[in-house]
Amino acid sequence: KLKAIIEENQAQDYIHLKGHQDLTEVYKDYELYLSGSKSEGFGLTLLEAVGSGLGMIGFDVRYGNQTFIKDNENGYLIPRFEKDDEPAIVAALAEKIVAFFNRSDLDHVHQVSYDIAKGFLTEEIEQKWLNLVKEMTSHD
């Protein structure tokens, strides 16, 4: 359906559907993942980035960022702004980027990200489901 919309609008020269891309090798070239969205769900890119041990910076929005960013541990959560004050938002983001690269404990940052990601390994998720099913089916 997306392909048809792209063709209908003659946009195939500049819109290309690439499918899922494995970014594991790409993440190895970076130290930091920035999540600039003002709303976020459980994002696969967030999980991939934290699983690659990257430092994380994002806005303190419900779900995704709060799940993967432990403020002052593996990066920074930037408080939400009540209104769209773009200069203040950009300044807050820039301040946290500078603070991140001024840290002397980047090895700790990377380890915290790895530790967060461990909770999302297939074996961990399977065990959580098994525990839930056992809890729900036990007759006390």
Q: At which residue positions do the language-model features occur?
A:
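C-terminal alpha-helical cap of glycosyltransferases
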Residues: 98-102, 119-140
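Short alpha-helical donor nucleotide-sugar binding micro-motif in glycosyltransferases
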Residues: 20-21, 25-30
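A short hydrophobic beta-strand element within the catalytic core of glycosyltransferases
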Residues: 33-34, 57
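Aromatic "clamp/platform" in nucleotide-sugar-dependent glycosyltransferases that forms part
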Residues: 38
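Short hydrophobic beta-strand element within catalytic cores of glycosyltransferases
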Residues: 55-59, 69
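Active-site donor-binding acidic/aromatic loop of nucleotide-activated sugar
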Residues: 12-20
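A short, well-ordered alpha-helix in the C-terminal region of glycosyltransferases
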Residues: 105-119
